[in-house]
Amino acid sequence: MSLDFNEMQERQKALQARYAGWWEPIDPEHGKNKILWMLAELGEAIQIVKRKPVSELMQEGSVRSDFIEEMADVLMYFNDVMLCYDIKPEEFAAVYRAKHGRNMTRWKKPGE
């Protein structure tokens, strides 16, 4: 089952509502903090990649599960950042697709 940005953002809104008053709010003033938390979670994923053999990342088990969980944390904060700055999934998708299109022709491979 796939997961899209609309669902992720709805889940983040529900999480924020559950902890309202305890967690910092989702607004532009706190966007910077969400980016920093996202980077901290990415750092945790990086530590797993640095310290564990790639074979353990590629096979079912606790290392792979822990790595995927850290990546999920990164995406949770990524969606918080999008919510802080009122970036809609459709807006992000359009920019992503445009950037991908530019990157597909940005560099020439040898012989092209």
Locations of the language-model features?
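Flexible "arm" and connector segments at domain edges
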Residues: M1-E112
